[in-house]
Amino acid sequence: MQVMTSRFGTLEINPSDLLHFPQGIPAFEHLKEFFFYPIPENPAFTWLQAAADPEVAFLLVDPFLFFPGYAVDLPARLQEELAIKDPADALVYAVVTIPDGDIRRATANLVGPIIINPTVRLGMQLILEGTKYTTRHQLFKESFSDDESIPSSGGNEG
C-alpha cells in the first residue's frame, strides 16, 4: 500500500508492517494505524508515522540507551490489551522533542512511553503515574559543536 507522508514523500508499506493502536495516541485518538520508518544512519532513533495522516509522525528513541536506570512496569491491564505474554518481549520507546530543530537540545518524554508488542503489532502510549519521570529529559548531556556528529548506537529492535 502507498502512504503519503510530509517528511518522507510517498512510501510503499506492506500492510503487515502496520502497528495497530486501538486507543490511538493521546491527542491523536482518531489515528489507529502507524508504522516504523527507521533512520539507518542512527538506529537508536526511528519515526512512528501515522498511516492515515501525512503530517503526523513521532520521533522515537530507545530510552534505555540514554537513561540506563529507566524502568517501566507494564500494568496487567496494558499487558492484556496488547497481548503481551512476557514484559521482556515488549518494545519501549520514548517520544523525542527537538526544540527549534536543535538536536543538541532534544528531550525525551519518559513519563509517556510508547509500548509495542512486536509479535501481534499492537501498541499504545502508557502514561506513568506517581513517577519521578517528566516529559522533558535532556538526551544529550554534553554539548556538540556544529561540526561534530551525535553518536549512534543500537538498542530496541523493531
Curated annotation (Swiss-Prot):
SUPFAM superfamilies: BH3618-like (SSF141457). It comes from the Bacteria. One of its GO terms (biological process) is regulation of translation. Its main location: cytoplasm. Belongs to the FliW family. GO terms for cellular component: cytoplasm. Keywords: Bacterial flagellum biogenesis, Chaperone, Cytoplasm, Translation regulation. Disulfide bonds: none annotated. The gene is fliW. Gene3D superfamilies: BH3618-like. This is Flagellar assembly factor FliW. Interacts with translational regulator CsrA and flagellin(s). Pfam families: FliW. Acts as an anti-CsrA protein, binds CsrA and prevents it from repressing translation of its target genes, one of which is flagellin. Binds to flagellin and participates in the assembly of the flagellum.
